[in-house]
Every structure is written in structure tokens, then in C-alpha cells.
């Protein structure tokens, strides 16, 4: 019998960004799909993506060039097979997006033909970024949300946080261990509900909220990585956290990202005295990969004792800047900064989680019936450093690939007959919520200071000791008090913080986004860092 707080579908998708919604739309003609969104439907990282989507649309470009650029940016740790798989399926997946109604910017060629306007970003040897001005993510997410919201086979649940996955062995079912559903905190009703499904997909995004400064929306708390780990899945390469080099330094807009496309179109990075510095660090200057640019900015800030560096595109024509970057122009103007006339104060900020839950080419994890797609996953695409505009692409390709696999397996997949309700009989309401707030701030501050852009073994050891103490406090709190949104996110962030530090301690070299003063050189024949539960 189905209880009032139980929901049943063929496929449960946890997350409502480009990965989750593209998968839902591909599945929906064939089965019943439930999509969980932590906040409003369009609140994920996809909505805020400014840059674009990398795909070969220019006849002078090639898939092999896209592959080579990605391998170079990944600093020797990309899985070449995964890179080739994604690059070779890029155009068809972008075309699917266009067919859904996404409008990318176009231009008129010299012979009068209309074609897509392609921009170039750091690490790319060709112009291959399709974009919608400087708000590509907003266009993609708005289109997918509109389609999903109106599809009769897609049920969307907003303001719902997954608490944990339910596995067959935990409820006494015989046979191979598999995922059978999830417990979900309904923030509107303030109660935990049960979701049953034949397949569960994690499309929960990354874990950048583990750091004090981040470009990500508030919901990026590593939920999927933590839940998969607790359910018995391996994770990989979590030491590689990308810090976006150019986040606006302003008290009223702490997580506003300034797209790489600004540098792609000629913006300079400058010291407070107006002098350029990137050519001192890399011959590619402002177009060097993000890890090099972020470290250079961090180095100059520390060397000069400066609060920030500056990004300057004021030497470009005003019309050009306003046409290409209208959203950024308006946002900065509202803060009293004129992009066309002055340099913008910037700092690096946590931006993207390159590692994640280990998956195969269809997004399958170690747990039967459980998939992970998008930023939550480790596919091997990004290696030690993600190249600009490859992330939305990965979401789309794995949304397609996972859908193919799920639809093949659904006819023989079994739905669990009954799942136990969430048990709150032995917990009370908390009278110490200040504990959560304190631990939250402490975690994000020491992760920024000790596990940030530049690391040392002592800093990592210090962070791990703090994490162990926090975990004990949070586990005790979780066992004794009713859950809340902040408690759920903190529990997951502390778990992911531990995994990040453990991965970082295992890598005895500096490579890509992982830079440690104790091991400044690269080793030969590097391997992914894989942790087993």
C-alpha cells in the first residue's frame, strides 16, 4: 500500500540543472519521471553559467583539436576515451538543445550566410563556444524548465532535499545490492517523504560551497557525492577543485562570476597600479588555463598584500563590450562600476568540482540502478583541470548516454514493493541551532585557508583534524535532533570536505588544480586518486 508521504516513478532524478532536465526530457516519452529540485526549479549552477558550450561547428576546427585541447588542459590526467566520447557526441547533443528551442547567438558571414557566433575561451585553440550573449546558462535552463514543466510524464518537486539513498540491503531485500529509492526532506511540509523508483540518478552538481568564497549558488553542497559515498560508491579526483580566476570582489555581490569570455575577447588582468602580470607567468597570458591564471592572481595578491587584482576590457569599443556582455554590464552598472570605462576588482573563488562519483560511459555508478551525471560525477573528462565550457557539454552528453542505458534496462528493472517510512520517533526539536551556524562558518573558512589554491601537507593535516572533530559533533546532532536544511547540507559538506582532503593527501605532486608547496613537481605516469568506502 502507498502511504500519503510516498511517491512512485520509474526514474527519480535528484537535481534540476542541465544534466537532470536533459535526461528527464529524453526519458519522458517512454516512462514516468520525478525530478527533485532543492530550490526553485531554475536555481542550480546551470542558470548562472555565463560562458557557453564547446562543440565543433566551425569547418576550420576539428573533434581531434577539441580532444587535444581538453587533454592539455587536464594536465595528463584525463581519460582519453572519455574525452573522445564527449567531443565526438558534442555537436549532436548541442543540436538536440537547439531542437528544444535554445537560441544561440548568430552572426552574418562575409558571404551573407547566417551562422553561429563562436567565441574562444582559455585553453581552446579555436573559436568553438556556442553562447547566448553572456547568459548561456539562463537560456538553456529556462528552455529546459519550460519543456519539463509542461510534460505530462515529468513530475517536478521543488524545495525538496534528498536526505539519503535507500539501498536494498538496508531494508532486507535479497539479491544484488541496488538502489530502490531515496528519503527526501520536503521543506514546504517540513517532513521526510519516501520516493520509490526503478532507477535513481544523481544530478546534484558540485561541492564548491565547502569553500568560503565561491561563484556557485547556495545549493552546491556536495549532496550527491556524500550520498553516493554513504551508499558504497567510489569517488575520484576530489583534490581537483577549480577556482575561477575572476569573481567580482564587491561586498554586495560576493559570488558574481566574470566569464572567461571577457579574456577571450581581449580583457587584461592588471595589478592595482595598472600593470599587466599574466605574461610573467605564462606565454599564453590571459588565455592560459584557469589553474595557472588563478594561481598567478593568488600569488600577486599575496606578494603585494592586495585585497584583489583587476580585470580590464575598457580599451575595447563601448558598443562591442555592451553587445557581447549585456548582463555583466548591467549588473556591474547597478553596483556603480562601468565595464566600458574602468577596471573591475576581482578575486579567485571556488567554482567547479572536477572529481566526483566514479561512473562509466553511461553514468552508471558502483551501485546497481544508481547513475550520476554532470558535475557530481567523475567521468575522466576534466582530469586535473576543467577546460572552459566543457561542463555544460558533459551534462548534455551524459544526459543522453544515461537515458539510452536506463531505457534499455527499465523493462527488466524491479520496483521495490514497500519502503519503510522515515523514523523520527527518537529525535527532538533542536534548541542549539547556533551550533550548526558556527560549524558551517568554521568549515568553509578552514577549507579556504588550508585546502585552497596553494596547499601544504601541514595545512591538509590541520584541516583533517578539524573535520574529524566537526564530524563527531554533526553525527551526534543528526542522531538526536530533527533535520533541517542547514543540518543536511552541513552533514554533506563535512563528508565531502573529508574526501577532498584525503584525496589531496594522497597526491604527492603538484598537477593542474592541486598545487602543494611540499611536492612542487609532477611525477611520471600519474593516476586518478580513487577512494573506496
Swiss-Prot record:
Q: Which family does it belong to?
A: Belongs to the FAD-dependent oxidoreductase 2 family. NadB subfamily.
* GO terms of molecular function: L-aspartate oxidase activity; nucleotide binding
Positions of FAD binding: 16-19, 38, 45-52, 223, 375, 391-392
Query: According to the UniProt entry, where is the signal peptide?
Result: none
Q: What's the protein called, per UniProt? A: L-aspartate oxidase
- Catalyzed reaction equations: L-aspartate + O2 = iminosuccinate + H2O2
Q: Which cysteine pairs are joined by S-S bonds?
A: none
Gene3D superfamilies cross-referenced by the UniProt entry? FAD/NAD(P)-binding domain, Fumarate reductase/succinate dehydrogenase flavoprotein-like, C-terminal domain, Succinate dehydrogenase/fumarate reductase flavoprotein, catalytic domain
Q: Which cofactor does it need?
A: FAD
Superkingdom of origin: Bacteria
